[in-house]
């Protein structure tokens, strides 16, 4: 509302964007602040690289989300910034998946079977999806990268990060022994 007020009252050039679960390579993937796609990619990569197929999922895994790949987000931001539209826009995808489905997709990408272990933990809201009607109507923007393709790109990068981290930890253990 403040941005709209400053636009209407003082002529400020403003843009308002609600981002919906943006993910991709080079994002936070470890440490507890990562989004679900990165956390799942990390857990599946650890399962693959250590041979332990168990993957922890907070809650029952039936909470739903939509996820937007970073390259689609960047294109959306460019379109928004180049427009003169100053009202709120959602930027995300409208494909809803459960966390359990997300684990299955990433496990398929990794080429492994996992055992889902549902544990108590923060789950957030039960369901959240991006309504892209307005951004589609106003700017003609649609995400172009499928969830599977975005997760494949993300998984490859995160698996490499996990491999490097495991190698560092292994070398520290052998040095201290």
Language-model region placement:
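C-terminal substrate-binding subdomain of Rossmann-fold SDR/epimerase-dehydratase oxidoreductases
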Residues: 40, 46-177
